[in-house]
A protein has these predicted regions:
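Cytosolic juxtamembrane N-terminal segment immediately preceding the first transmembrane helix
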Residues: 1-37
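Extracytoplasmic gate region of multi-pass secondary transporters
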Residues: 42-43, 249-307
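Extracellular/periplasmic helix-loop-helix junction of adjacent transmembrane segments
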Residues: 43-72
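Interfacial helix-cap and linker-helix signal at transmembrane-aqueous boundaries
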Residues: 49-50, 80-81, 165-173, 282-283, ...
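Helix-breaking motifs and short loop linkers at transmembrane-helix boundaries and internal kinks
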Residues: 54, 85, 106-112, 140, ...
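Conserved MFS/SLC helix-loop-helix module at the cytosolic interface between two early adjacent transmembrane helices
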Residues: 72-110
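Glycine-rich segments within core transmembrane alpha-helices of 12-TM secondary carriers
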Residues: 145-171, 185-186, 386-396
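Central mid-sequence intracellular linker of multi-pass
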Residues: 175-238, 425-447
């Protein structure tokens, strides 16, 4: 390495979290909060909208069109981000889904609604993979996992507050007000990002972009670093060539990529299956309407707390043992939900713990995907895994709807536990694959020619 070379990777790894990085985390977190708000608020808007339009049922179709858009957007815009950068894609996607959400407030027919929600979903799909990737790339090594988990939990926070905001707005201003709110806030966030959000320093270095721009943002990360006009910037990886989605399977990554996809698919089919049907099934178990709604709330609350709580254990013990515990524990808790004789208090606790495992596992899935791939494939890798997972999120509610009249409640939740168990197995296998790859890399590095 040249005497005037500055290693970007090591500088960020060894830095402290300063106000500049916190600003990056906050902006990315706000994007994810509004992402979660947009997806979840539809469930609260639908009854008022369909009453006004005189439609009996189409909520599932609208939700599915949004999720299909998210699935496609996760893949397409993630590949684009690995070509042109995280910053332009995040800003563009935020302003894009802001505009489409505002347009949603003006639709007058079901066909218009279906089309607009699909198109809006394309932009929503770009947010999670690029926000998580950028946060990881600006985080010091010792706090990277926690930063990615906290920021990705913004989606869960947004989903949780959607109900409160929609409940306040709809009776006073009508269902359209929810979309006005959901479109205006990301517009402001997008403008703030345009002013303050930096590009990934690793990306800029690998793409051989302006040294002055790299120096400007690197100084914000580590003010004490000595830079001169002759400074050259390097990272601890090489630029990868080829079609990004195909390259995910190169250099020994094929098995790991497929296992990541399996983890995302199984967990998201479970998450959306339970989020959609828990209150309805609880009502069928004999609970009062208020108690049945509380079951769904406990699931989301457990998820919000668990998504942050697993950060320290992962930093101490690593991803794989913690995620196996999350998914394995969730499988047990889900199986217990349908057990006869479960008291209401016990049901709330079991559902809370199931939500903890499922949502915490999802946050962990996103973080481990971001650490698995190199910079030039990071957004594509996270986005592709989420895109495959979104297939599960689309199928989940329909699978539950098909199974519900054919199985007893006890049998139903035993079946619901299977995806969590498969997620735990996939995590264990991925851990073995990554440990074997790390051992081989270390052996190669220490071999003397």
């Amino acid at each position: 390495m040249a005497a005037n070379a500055i290693n970007i990777t090591e500088t960020i790894d060894n830095s402290q979290v300063r106000s500049f990085q916190i600003g990056v985390f906050v902006l990315c977190g706000l994007c994810l909060i509004m992402d979660g708000f947009d997806v979840q608020s539809w469930g609260f808007v639908a009854p008022a909208l369909f009453t006004e339009w005189g439609i009996t049922s189409a909520a599932g179709r609208v939700a599915s069109m949004t999720l299909i858009g998210v699935m496609i957007g996760s893949l397409l815009f993630s590949m684009l981000a690995d070509k042109i950068g995280r910053r332009p894609v995040l800003i563009g996607a935020t302003l894009y889904f802001s505009a489409l959400t505002l347009i949603t407030a003006r639709v007058t027919t079901l066909d218009q609604l279906l089309i607009i929600r699909f198109i809006a979903g394309l932009g929503l799909g770009a947010i999670m993979p690029n926000a998580v990737a950028l946060v990881g790339e600006y985080s010091p090594k010792q706090s990277r996992v926690m930063a990615m988990l906290v920021v990705s939990n913004g989606f869960t926070v947004g989903a949780a507050v959607a109900g409160f905001i929609a409940t306040y707005l709809i009776p006073r201003f009508g269902w359209r007000s929810v979309f006005y709110f959901g479109g205006t806030v990301p517009l402001v966030i997008g403008l703030l990002m345009f002013v303050a959000l930096p590009e990934s320093l690793q990306f800029l270095t690998l793409k051989k972009k302006s040294g002055d721009l790299i120096a400007k943002w690197l100084k914000r990360v580590e003010p004490s670093i000595a830079l001169t006009p002759a400074s050259q910037f390097v990272v601890n990886e090489e630029k990868k060539e080829g079609v990004p989605i195909v390259t995910l399977f190169h250099e020994g990554r094929a098995t790991g990529t497929l296992l990541l996809w399996t983890m995302q698919f199984m967990n998201l089919i479970n998450l959306y299956m339970l989020s959609t049907w828990l209150p309805t099934i609880a009502r069928g178990m004999g609970l009062a309407a208020t108690a049945a709604l509380m079951v769904g709330t406990m699931f989301q609350t457990g998820g919000a707390i668990g998504s942050i709580a697993i950060g320290k254990p992962i930093e101490k013990w690593g991803f794989f043992g913690v995620l196996i515990a999350c998914f394995g524990g969730a499988a047990v808790m889900i199986a217990l939900i349908g057990q006869p004789g479960l008291t209401k208090s016990m049901l709330f606790v079991v559902v809370f713990l199931a939500g903890w495992g499922i949502f915490a596992g999802q946050a962990g899935n996103n973080a481990v995907a971001a650490t698995y791939y190199p910079t030039t494939l990071r957004s594509t890798g996270v986005g592709a895994a989420l895109g495959v997972g979104r297939i599960g999120s689309i199928l989940g509610p329909y699978v539950a709807e098909y199974m519900r009249p054919r199985y007893s409640t006890h049998q139903l939740f035993l079946v619901f536990a299977v995806p969590a168990l498969l997620s735990a197995i996939a995590v264990g296998l991925l851990g073995m694959v990554m440990n074997r790859a790390a051992t081989a890399k270390a052996a190669k590095a220490t071999t003397i020619p």
